[in-house]
């Protein structure tokens, strides 16, 4: 089974990458910890930990005060907006910080819902995380009609014909995930945005799962909104929303009277998590530094981020192929999602399986005892597990690969699964 680890580790400098993450040195029951649980939250580099600690030591204050630590807090927040602007390909004042993607999406659904009523329609998909489903489905209480797009069960992809057929002149918003957090499918979001705009509807993209695996460019997508979570791309537990400036200024958020009416601050409820915002800049700079090590001639942050993802995509794809090919040799195993390596440009290295005779929880528990961290369940993609009729039996065993994972970890996982199944 060929791999490209040697070549790609040179391009990515895998030794340097792994040295940035202190958690990768952990052991469990004498086994090196292998973090294959990244779809639920990635590990963080030391610089993120340091940035959070440094803020609390030297800059801890509320905003807009007439003194040094408050000034520094303002500067740290502005710096993080600039960093996320480079990460997303947008202006800093189009970046909104929040508790998480779920709370940001509820806030936006409430604001957009103020303008909707009977006769209006919203298009959702059965592939999405519930955080990009339930906040919009709740608008049915206002008389809004909810249209649900089906999936192709054979490969867990969106039925694009069904999606196109459900968008019409009454459609006001189409919400879709960039990539499935359960089975790894990468959706054709650019086409979804085009279809939405052709009908005069807004396009809302959940990029939480895609963000650590590929470059984001909201200008190229022309989406109206895009949300992600920094703890899924090597940062602290926070949510980030991009909104076109025209929408952030026009829509009316629910907010406190004392809150500024200026955008993007008008969308940020209460006091933000300033220390985690400091960590966001550090995690974006980490990704950019990967790109600078790939191509030392690059200095600017946005080009460096793109260079990093160019290599991350190739490396993760090689790991994904090795894992998928290996899983298909395990008796009684069933892989959910795209399994043909020739189509892996349409999937993230997030693998969901079931193995006859073993519940996902049993498998995850036994793997965890060997230092192999995986997830079991539905991962809040409840519509998908119900459609595939696996919810009643514990959902899937999910394994997620990231650029800090190695071929050795993939091989350890496969050996462990074979031994567990053979007993």
Where on the chain are the PLM-derived regions?
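Pyridoxal 5′-phosphate
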Residues: 1-423
């Amino acid at each position: 089974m060929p791999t490209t680890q040697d070549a790609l580790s040179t391009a990515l400098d895998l030794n340097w990458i792994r040295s940035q993450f202190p958690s990768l040195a952990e052991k469990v029951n004498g086994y090196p910890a292998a973090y294959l649980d990244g779809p639920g939250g990635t590990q963080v580099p030391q610089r993120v930990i340091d940035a959070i600690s440094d803020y609390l030591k030297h800059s801890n204050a509320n905003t807009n005060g007439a003194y040094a630590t408050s000034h520094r807090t303002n500067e740290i927040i502005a710096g993080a907006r600039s960093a996320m602007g480079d990460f997303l390909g947008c202006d800093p004042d189009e970046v909104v910080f929040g508790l998480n993607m779920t709370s940001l999406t509820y806030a936006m659904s409430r604001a957009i819902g103020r303008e909707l009523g009977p006769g209006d329609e919203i298009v959702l998909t059965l592939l999405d995380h519930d955080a990009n489903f339930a906040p919009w489905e709740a608008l049915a209480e206002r008389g809004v009609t909810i249209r649900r797009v089906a999936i192709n069960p054979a490969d867990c992809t969106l039925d694009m014909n069904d999606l196109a057929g459900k968008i019409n002149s009454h459609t006001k918003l189409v919400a879709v995930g960039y990539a499935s957090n359960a089975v790894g499918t990468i959706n054709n979001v650019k086409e979804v945005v085009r279809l939405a705009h052709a009908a005069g509807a807004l396009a809302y993209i959940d990029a939480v799962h895609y963000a650590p695996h590929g470059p984001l460019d909201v200008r190229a997508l022309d989406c109206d909104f895009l949300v992600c979570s920094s703890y899924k791309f090597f940062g602290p537990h926070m949510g980030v929303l991009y909104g076109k400036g025209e929408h952030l200024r026009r829509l009316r958020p629910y907010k406190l009277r004392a809150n500024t009416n200026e955008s993007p601050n008008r969308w940020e409820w209460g006091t933000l998590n300033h220390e985690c915002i400091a960590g966001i800049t550090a995690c974006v700079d980490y990704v950019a530094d990967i790109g600078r090590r790939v191509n030392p001639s690059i200095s600017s942050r946005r080009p460096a981020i793109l260079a990093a993802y160019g290599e991350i995509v190739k490396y993760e794809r090689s790991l994904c192929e090795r894992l998928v090919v290996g899983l298909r040799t395990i008796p009684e195993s069933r892989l959910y999602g795209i399994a043909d390596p020739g189509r892996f440009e349409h999937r993230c290295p997030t693998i969901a399986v079931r193995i006859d005779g073993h519940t996902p929880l049993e498998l995850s528990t036994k793997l965890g005892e060997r230092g192999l961290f995986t997830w079991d369940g539905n991962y809040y993609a409840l519509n998908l597990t119900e459609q595939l009729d696996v919810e009643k039996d514990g959902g899937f065993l999910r394994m997620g690969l990231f650029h800090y994972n190695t071929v050795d970890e993939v091989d350890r996982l496969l050996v462990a699964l074979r031994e567990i199944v053979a007993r």
